[in-house]
Amino acid sequence: EAAQYSFALYTAGVAVESLLRAYVIQLDPILETGHYLPLLLQASKLHQAVTQRESELIDISLITLTRRWKNDLRYTSNQRLRRHLKKLKLDRGVRGDFLKENCRIAIEMATTILKIGVPKWKPS
């Protein structure tokens, strides 16, 4: 069975989106931000809850994840995702399977954000 890299990449982004929405909804339950992660991060005020170093890690991780993630990847085939990543030139300099490597990077970036943001979240 073929690995579903597109779904893995999609869920990495959705996990971060969900975390940021949890923060946003406490501040403004009706704010509509779409699926744009940088706007969600800004609206979440997560930076106010973390250290300077954690804030820098979140920014770097979010930029890296956002380059790869799009909300419409949910039902995307691996072939279409390969084309998407090639168009963004994210296949350059990668040894081996660039699709697998980009998914690994996306998951690593999402994990970094979640490891920082989840413990700081305080439900209202």
Give the role of each language-model region.
Residues 1-25:
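Short, hydrophobic, well-ordered secondary-structure elements
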Residues 24-124:
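Long, charged low-complexity segments
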